[in-house]
Each structure stands twice: as C-alpha cells, then as structure tokens.
Regions:
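Conserved, single-site charged/polar hotspot
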Residues: 1-208
Length: 208
C-alpha cells in the first residue's frame, strides 16, 4: 500500500506541477510554492465534480458522446469504458499497475475537466479521439493490466479546492518541468496548485 501511494504521488507531481528552471550565479530565488495541492476524490465527493451537462447511466457513471476520428462515427459510452483506450494510447500496457492507476486518475480528471471547460471540435461530441483535441486513444492496445487499473480507480478523480484541476502530464520532463504559462503557453492565471518539480534520480525516458 505504501509503495502504491509513493508511485502515485511521484506520478502526480511529475504530471501535474511545473515551474521554469533558474540559471546564473549567486543566490537563486526561492521556487514558488503551491497554494493548494490536488487530492484524490472518490464516491460522493467525486460525483459532485462531474460536469452537469453529462448524463449518467443506471449505475451513476457519467456518459460521453465520443467522436472516433478513424471510423468517423459518434458513439455514446461511459467514462469508464472510454478510459482503457486512453491509457493504452498514453502508456505501455506492461508498466507497473500503480503507475497505470495514477494515469487512470489523471485521464479521468482530464476528460471531465475538458468537458466542463471546452467544446469538442466535432459536432455533437463531448470529446473525440483526435490527439490534437484531447488525449491519445488506442483501443487495440488495451490489455488486462490496463483494465484492472481503470477498475481499481473507478470513479476517482483529483480535487483542487472543490474543482477539477488541469491534469496535465508528459512523457518525459527533461529533468525539470515548466509551469503552465511557460511550458504550455497557458494564457489564463497560473493555477494555484502548480509548482516546480525536478525529475527523479533515474529520470530516463522509457523505450517506446
């Protein structure tokens, strides 16, 4: 259990928070500290963060209208059915289960936050499989480990002061992440929960 939480928070820190590196001699300015830190939300607390525009199935799971760019079709499916292909598109299916679980929480937060803040570029859709719009999507790459990661985190999202945070993540930080305004050309005010995160001691990019 401790190992699982450690991996989760390492992934969370590397995926969500960022600030620019400082260079030059002399004393370095203190790195900005976050005003708040997103926490895991599940059950009733997570349900309260689901965008009102989304309908729910008989089990209370949010439903999405997803546009598949390959088949050029619009399909209605639950968030939980949408996530496995997203994980397969973003991570290798043989990664440690705890890493996949962390990514599942990030991906679930990402799609719900997207729906609450944006409109899909495809008519009638809440989100699409277009990587230019949202997350990678690879239905053919889904395996048992990925399905288990989604199942074990069912309904869990990140909660930042009663709101869904921007669940940004990356494949490799290069040793130090950048804050949203610098790394993503983010035009709004810097989110209160972003901060500088250095890479792990062994911060090598995994083989594709």
């Amino acid at each position: 259990m401790k190992r699982g939480w450690l991996i989760f928070f390492c992934a969370l820190c590397l995926c969500l928070f960022g600030c620019a590196a400082q260079s030059g001699g002399g004393d370095k300015p203190a790195l900005p500290q976050p005003e708040s830190t997103p926490s895991r939300a599940q059950g009733t607390s997570a349900a309260q963060l689901v965008p009102e525009r989304l309908s729910k199935n008989e089990s209370g799971v949010p439903m999405l209208r997803g546009y598949d760019v390959k088949s050029e079709t619009l399909e209605t499916l639950s968030v939980e059915d949408y996530l496995p292909a997203v994980l397969a598109g973003e991570m290798a299916g043989d990664w440690p289960l705890e890493a996949l679980k962390a990514q599942a929480i990030l991906a679930r937060t990402f799609v719900l936050q997207f729906v609450s803040q944006k409109e899909s570029m495809y008519d009638g859709a809440d989100i699409s499989t277009d990587i230019k719009e949202a997350q990678a999507y690879d239905a053919a790459g889904v395996n048992a480990r990925i399905r288990e990661a989604v199942k074990e985190t069912r309904g869990e999202v990140l909660n930042a002061g009663g709101e869904l945070p921007y669940a940004w993540f990356h494949a490799h930080s290069g040793g130090l992440t950048a804050r949203a305004k610098e790394g993503l050309d983010y035009e709004k005010a810097e989110p209160s929960y972003t901060q500088c995160v250095k890479g792990m001691e062994n911060d090598e990019a995994p083989a594709e």
